[in-house]
Design a protein with these regions (language model features):
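Acidic-basic catalytic patches of nuclease active cores, encompassing PD-(D/E)XK
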Residues: 1-6
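Mg2+/Mn2+-dependent nuclease catalytic core
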Residues: 7-117
Length: 120
């Protein structure tokens, strides 16, 4: 459960690993005192968890950028999806270990991007 929102639609960036930027939908303090990145998505139809890997990479990258910019330690991420077909909300949660796993996958993708589009 959410205790309070600490960031909403905030632009974040980091110079870590070549740098990246994005706008996090929400960072909230939970009732247990930990913090979560919350990402809101819309879809035409319900999503299977195996279809949302890109979303998981995104929230993991946000979690690190939140630390780099604000020194707030993110312990979980939540992906909330609203779909037009059933109008039933979907909710996917990631713990600290999931965030580490997906951040490493994000770094692999970022490295490939910088190989394709070198800065220098």
């Amino acid at each position: 459960r959410i205790k309070r929102t600490v960031m909403q639609e905030e632009f974040l960036w980091t110079h870590r690993n070549g740098g990246y930027a994005g706008t996090v939908d929400n960072v909230s303090e939970l009732v247990d005192g930990t913090y979560a990145v919350i990402d809101f998505k819309t879809a035409r139809k319900p999503k299977k968890e195996e279809w949302i890997e890109d979303y998981k990479l995104q929230v993991a990258a946000y979690a690190v950028a939140v630390w780099d910019r604000h020194k707030i330690k993110i312990s979980q991420a939540q992906i909330w999806i609203s779909n037009e077909q059933t109008m039933d909300p979907q909710y996917f949660e990631m713990n600290t270990e999931d965030l580490k796993l997906y951040y490493n996958k994000f770094l692999e993708r970022l490295e490939k991007f910088y190989e394709m589009f070198p800065i220098n």
